């Protein structure tokens, strides 16, 4: 079986905005969502830079106290983005009760509830003091377990923990399940906590930018003077659906998923690889039946680290050198949204494709010997987009690439 897979709904909760229209405008304007959180320095961080993500307000009219008690920060973000996605897809509560829908979400940590539980045990020496919800908050699968129970989802249900490629792999696997006829509709996405507990060990690697005098200029993918990434987070949700199923229920189709590629570098745990990136991109193109010259835009993984950007630039130059595809990293505006990044960047890419523009790679002022070979969009470019490639790479050498297509009957 080889079914077409389309996207019928999207939702976003990020530092660029908490609805699709606001995020689209932020992308078009090249608006940064990065700021300072001084308590990070007090806690012992080298850098106070972070994406500033609005805290969701989930009232008792939306969810009862019992449910909210089991929801950590990242699950709350994902709940809000999934509400948006179901609404755009015109999937009602009644539809959810009467039809099987799956859920595959990317998430790779839930640090705050784990640390809070440890503090309570150290202080009180009594597990009864932990209360009801912390066990459900503490598991990597917390987003899936919350979404599946809140929305009464009865299809496939598991979490992808694949570092910073988690959100992208979730879309890829949802795509494969629908393509092969195993599911009709799958809620896919990624979520990332933003609390300062969650990123302390990342800061310890010296991977974060310390350009604290200019927060909005700190994330500068591919720029010669980049000094590290800026952590960020939130959630992104996408409704993937079999084309015939979507057509039969009169759904509005936003885009089509036509290719998914993956690979593993097989090297050092934090060592990027141009070869692994090329394999993932090549597989995605082959599955989609398109060539490198057919791609109009590439949403690069580039996080603003020296090695990561260098190796991706090498891979992109090998595959797309001399081709017309424009390249930018939306992380220049969002910072690195980690576990959600592959999903949020799919949303960002689709918003660009729907509105025929390429968001800029802001803060790119000086190329280095690798990025000077790339066709980077450093300002907003209005141009027709029919095929886009979105890259996501992560610790442990995991690589994912998605090819998304403007929908045509």
Regions found by a protein language model. Give the residues of each.
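A glycine- and small-aliphatic-rich helix-loop capping segment at beta-alpha/alpha-beta transitions
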Residues: 21-28, 112-128, 177-180, 201-212, ...
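Conserved beta-ketoacyl condensing-enzyme motif
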Residues: 7, 29-162, 191-199, 292-308
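Glycine-/small-residue-rich "gating" segment that lines the acyl/pantetheine channel
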Residues: 124-131, 172, 176, 193-248, ...
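Conserved small-residue
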Residues: 7-9, 27, 82, 103, ...
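Active-site-proximal alpha-helical scaffold in enzymes
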Residues: 78-91, 140-143, 148-151, 157-191, ...
